[in-house]
From Swiss-Prot:
The encoding gene: murD
Listed name of the protein: UDP-N-acetylmuramoylalanine--D-glutamate ligase
Subcellular location: Cytoplasm
Native source species: Acidobacterium capsulatum (strain ATCC 51196 / DSM 11244 / BCRC 80197 / JCM 7670 / NBRC 15755 / NCIMB 13165 / 161)
Catalytic activity: UDP-N-acetyl-alpha-D-muramoyl-L-alanine + D-glutamate + ATP = UDP-N-acetyl-alpha-D-muramoyl-L-alanyl-D-glutamate + ADP + phosphate + H(+)
Uppermost EC category: ligase
Lineage start: Bacteria, Pseudomonadati, Acidobacteriota, Terriglobia, Terriglobales
Length: 461
């Protein structure tokens, strides 16, 4: 893909948009960045862009700016129904995303992981396993560095391990990972995609360019993910907690096993008891990583050692502290209902659950069966609070806390020794926080302010 002298517009100046703009400029393109945010809001990044000869359009998108380009690169946070994109698409102007741009230049082998939940943990674990096998590994995508920022350091003999979201997949065309993983597909981001069917279609783009030379790893226990097999040209491998798999990774008699082919011998990998991560969903994440790593040629011994040493990723069912016999867990990354369900299922009972944030057109009623005998009370926060309380009315005691600060204080004060205070919001964070990371950090700060106390001490009014 020749970029020198081409007029390229980058739409959206988030982390990936900024990285894409700088990459394009280094490759000789005439780059413009367009963002709906004001120049004041973008003041941190504008000077560096101008210094590199990149033009900046702030405070809105101009249709003429879009029409003057040879190529448009869309950041994942920008909806494809943005009016200016809809208009220029009619003229046949190429529109791709940052991941697709990177895929045209990335060297070496690619392992790409998507799913509604578990992406970050599985991606991080796969990276750790490949590093344990002394491979040259870069990890990025929807976590850490944008994919485009990995290009310059990529090597023909190396691996790029990528977490890829549905937003990123929407704008892919030739993105072809040698190994692709779909962990699960449950309703999420319906406010963006419009329907579950559209969301599934976006997820399935991860294997759209694959051939029979490539591998696709699917969750045999997840209906939507497993149905993807019928639409794939790839070699299919499976993972399952619940059944023996002919080709892939599975659990049998308390051990994780792997079978490379239907007629191959079964290889023992490690006992479930040696997985350091909490929750059945993390067994699935480990199974997916085991399958991917064996297909990448990593030995069972290296996989076992890496899994044993792996620790929970921040904001993902992260243990924060025990205060007065009460355990506090931060699962701020549980930004949808299915993720919250898996967090709740990780504990046998005694849960004081903090739910809420910005609604994503979710159905919280699916949590009702989990409440009896497991959740002592729900503390609602954010703009979704009223909807959550309506959906869970009568299933569990409900406390309208409003803010995370008050929710933590109320839950900490009500919990008894042996109980758990769990932040698993089932919502995005953007109504009260910059992102889920900030929400999780605030939760941890609120909890740790009480560390060392014999019992929870509520803040004074």
């Amino acid at each position: 893909m020749e970029l020198k002298g081409k007029k390229v517009l980058v739409v959206g100046l988030g982390k990936s948009g900024l990285a894409a703009a700088l990459f394009l400029r280094r490759r000789g393109a005439q780059v413009t960045v367009s963002d709906i945010r004001s120049a004041e809001a973008l003041s941190k990044d504008i000077p560096a862009l101008i210094e590199q000869g990149i033009a900046v359009e702030a405070g809105g998108h101009g249709l003429l700016t879009f029409r003057r380009q040879d190529l448009i690169v869309v950041s994942p946070g920008v909806p494809l129904d943005t009016p200016e994109l809809v208009q220029v698409r009619k003229f046949g102007l190429p529109i791709i995303g940052e991941v697709e741009l990177a895929a045209r230049f990335l060297k070496g082998k690619t392992l790409a992981i998507t799913g509604s939940n578990g992406k970050t943990t599985t991606t991080s674990l796969c990276g750790a396993i490949l590093e344990r096998a002394h491979q040259h590994v870069q990890v990025g995508g929807n976590i850490g560095l944008p994919v485009i920022a990995l290009v310059d350091d990529s090597r023909d003999d190396g691996w790029s391990v990528l977490e890829i979201s549905s937003f990123q997949l929407e704008t892919t065309e030739r993105f072809r990972p040698g190994i692709a993983v779909i962990l699960n597909i449950t309703p999420d981001h319906l406010d963006r995609h419009g329907s579950f069917e559209n969301y599934v279609a976006a997820k399935e783009r991860i294997f759209a360019a694959q051939t029979h030379d490539d591998a696709l790893i699917l969750n045999a226990d997840d209906d939507a993910a497993s149905r993807a097999a019928a639409r794939a040209s790839s070699r299919i491998f499976w993972f399952s907690r619940n059944r023996v798999i002919r080709q892939g990774a599975f659990v049998h008699e308390g051990n994780i096993l792997f079978r490379a082919a239907e007629d191959a011998a079964t290889e023992p990998i490690l006992p479930l008891s040696e997985i350091p991560l909490k929750g059945a969903h993390n067994v699935e994440n480990v199974l997916a990583a085991v399958c991917a790593a064996r297909l990448a040629g990593v030995s069972a011994e290296a996989i076992r050692d890496a899994v044993r040493d792996f620790r929970a990723v921040e904001h993902r069912l992260e243990f924060v502290a025990e205060i007065g016999g009460v355990s506090f867990y931060n699962d701020s990354k549980a930004t949808n209902v299915d993720a919250a369900r898996k967090a709740i299922e990780a504990f046998p009972g005694g849960i004081h659950l903090i739910l809420g944030g910005k609604d994503k057109n979710s159905d919280y009623r699916t949590l009702r069966p989990l409440m009896a005998g497991r959740v002592k009370a729900v503390y609602t926060i954010g703009s979704a609070a009223e909807k959550i309380m309506t959906h869970l009315d009568g299933a569990v005691p409900l406390i309208a806390a409003g803010t995370l600060d008050l929710a933590v204080n109320l839950a900490g004060g009500a919990a008894s020794p042996g109980d758990v205070v769990l932040l698993a919001p089932a919502c995005s964070s953007f109504d009260q926080f910059e992102n889920y990371e900030q929400r999780g950090q605030v939760f941890k700060d609120l909890v740790l302010a009480h560390r060392g106390a014999a019992a929870w001490q509520n803040a004074s009014a």
